[in-house]
Design a protein with these regions (language model features):
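Conserved acetyl-CoA-binding loop-helix of GNAT-fold acetyltransferases
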Residues: 98-101, 107-121, 143-148
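Conserved active-site alpha-helix within GNAT-family acetyltransferase domains
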Residues: 137-155
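Conserved beta-strand edge residues that scaffold enzyme active sites
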Residues: 136-137, 160
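A short, internal acetyl-CoA/4′-phosphopantetheine-binding micro-motif in the GNAT/acyltransferase core
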Residues: 83-84, 96-107, 136
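Conserved GNAT acetyl-CoA-binding A-motif
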Residues: 124-134
């Protein structure tokens, strides 16, 4: 069964293995935790992410962000970064959701099914009547994922498509 679970201490070992298997920056998905030690993950990253998800100790111009791992039964297959509030930078850029699927689980529909779960999770909690997402133009698979979830291309620049999903 496929489900989302927020970053937590109970699953720290599996979360650590998953998050460190995702590259630092691949296809526009930035993973600032790719090279941390397990101790740093448990003692620093998880507590910091918990606080920041509640809006505590945010850096200037930052919004609360939640990390949801996508699980298929007892295996983590991906990671979704979710922002329920947007600032101007996010509204014009990355948007509400960023996601990455662990390489060995790609091309199995996990991104589409995970994105649908995230949309369902946040649709009643965001201020906008659309979900904002961006995608690198050189990542057609991610664009296809978004289109499969009802997205349309709202805007574009040289490097990115900016999509919207009506809710």
């Amino acid at each position: 069964m496929l489900f989302l679970k927020e970053m937590n201490f109970e699953d720290a070992k599996k979360e650590y293995i998953a998050i460190t298997s995702i590259p630092k920056d691949e296809n526009g998905f930035e993973n600032k935790f790719y090279n941390v030690s397990f101790e740093e993950f448990v003692n620093g990253i998880i507590p910091t992410c918990e606080k920041q998800s509640k809006g505590i100790d945010l850096k200037p111009n930052r919004v609360p962000q939640n990390y949801y791992f996508l699980w298929d039964d007892d295996e983590i297959v991906g990671l979704f970064k979710v922002r329920k509030k947007l600032n101007d930078s996010l509204r014009e850029g990355a948007g509400h959701i960023g996601y990455g699927i662990i390489k060995k689980y790609r091309n199995r529909g996990y991104a589409t099914r995970g994105l649908k779960l995230v949309i369902e999770l946040i649709k009643d909690e965001i201020e906008e009547d659309e979900i904002y997402i961006s995608v690198n133009k050189d990542n057609p698979y991610s664009l296809k994922t978004q289109l499969n979830c009802g997205a349309y291309i709202f805007n574009e620049n040289e490097d990115h498509y900016f999509t919207r999903i009506k809710i």
